[in-house]
Amino acid sequence: MFASIKDILKNPILNSNVTINGWIRTKRSNGKIGFIEINDGSTLKGIQAVINEEENQFSEKDLKKLTTGTSISLTGLLVESPAKGQNYEIKTHSFNVIGETDPETYPLQKKRHSFEFLREIPHLRIRTNTFGAIARVRNKISYKIHEYFQKNGFFYINTPIITSNDGEGAGEMFRVSTLKFNKLNNALSNIDFKDDFFGKEAFLSVTGQLHGEAYAMALSKIYTFGPTFRAENSNTTRHASEFWMIEPEMAFYKLNDNIALAEDLLKYLLSSILNECSQDMDFLENYIEKGLIKKLENVINSNFEVITYTKAIEILENSKKNFEIKPYWGIDLQTDHERYLTEETFKKPVVVIDYPKNFKAFYMKANKDNKTVKGMDILVPKIGEIIGGSEREDDLQKLENRIKELNLNIEHLNWYLDLRRFGSAPHSGFGLGLERLVQYSTGISNIRDSIPFPRTPKNLYF
């Protein structure tokens, strides 16, 4: 029976025989004594195995197979290590090479590789310390998301990935079709989608929100956590075409309740990774972003500042900052606007509310001025927006008017209007992008490094 390296290091039984399985990260030798570092992914640091050729009968053929990247099963005695930087090591009794690696063609060597290079081999980059740390932090965040909502009386629901609705009204959707390409080459307006698989136009979902609202109108508090897709041709460090979204919906929640929940969730997740991923976070602090831990602690320990969009524009207009896009009332806040508010004005997270309705989604509840909506964005230092949400429009007539005003297909949304026809209630929700949170939590500068196999414009590895 073998144990994970994490368990062995957590509960070491000195002078006991242990068996580990893993991959060789490094190999060096000093005469007849060899040293290999083995990692199985369970923890950042692997464990050193000492191979003494004089004490044990190891064949020259087998020793030559011990190269970086090789998978191995090894048994030996767990002892205290005299070397600096490690408490324990294994005095090897026997080993079995499971999968050999040709050192001449293996792309990962004992050196720091650029993120650009590693993006070309996403199937292998997970074997580096950096991407191992990112993966473990992502795993912890995902687990804690479920833990948080389950502890707070939410029901987890699964919403469709294939849909006929544009949940955001932006039109940036991937089409799903089984029609022959020669038919698709014609203008889309000439295609009869009755011949298609679903008998109508179908798309990959951009949000689970609308379907989530249906369940919130019966279960009161729900959350979705799944993949979403945006056909937005943006080659930036903050956008991906496929990403995972956390979307809670709560009946009887007003905007202030929504903000309080989002703030509490964010602080809970950041506290969890600092407390439970300390080794990985220390590594990321040292090698990826200096000041990372302090940045996250600032979010955890701050009371988020709540300001209106109008106030935000006033602050930006009165600043002496030379923004790339000049701020004025009616423009959507840009990343440098958001960062100015969080990093230079308030020096902590900021919640901007009451946005102009002209660039917000159709489902957001209108304010009494009929110019702004009860939307909210949570902005954090370094990256800007990390959570976006709103109080939803629960008035049937107002929602119908807004749909018509935006020339959306009201027939496709008739089921959504039913939620207002039958037992409508105030409700709110928000979306938190997992990849953007991972990006922020780990300090990596590009969202492509926060997801195992990134999907971006002109990029579809595997």
Swiss-Prot record:
It catalyses: tRNA(Asn) + L-asparagine + ATP = L-asparaginyl-tRNA(Asn) + AMP + diphosphate + H(+). GO terms for cellular component: cytosol. One of its GO terms (molecular function) is ATP binding. It is found in: Cytoplasm. Keywords: Aminoacyl-tRNA synthetase, ATP-binding, Cytoplasm, Ligase, Nucleotide-binding, Protein biosynthesis. InterPro entries: Aa-tRNA-synt_II, aa-tRNA-synth_II, aa-tRNA-synth_II/BPL/LPL, Asn-tRNA-ligase, Asp/Asn-tRNA-synth_IIb, NA-bd_OB-fold, NA-bd_OB_tRNA. GO terms for biological process: asparaginyl-tRNA aminoacylation. It holds the Pfam family tRNA_anti-codon. It is an enzyme of class 6 (ligase). Its EC number is 6.1.1.22. SUPFAM superfamilies: Class II aaRS and biotin synthetases, Nucleic acid-binding proteins. It comes from the Bacteria. NCBIfam families: asnS, PRK03932.1. Belongs to the class-II aminoacyl-tRNA synthetase family. PANTHER family: ASPARAGINE--TRNA LIGASE, MITOCHONDRIAL-RELATED, ASPARTYL/LYSYL-TRNA SYNTHETASE. Homodimer. This is Asparagine--tRNA ligase. The gene is asnS.
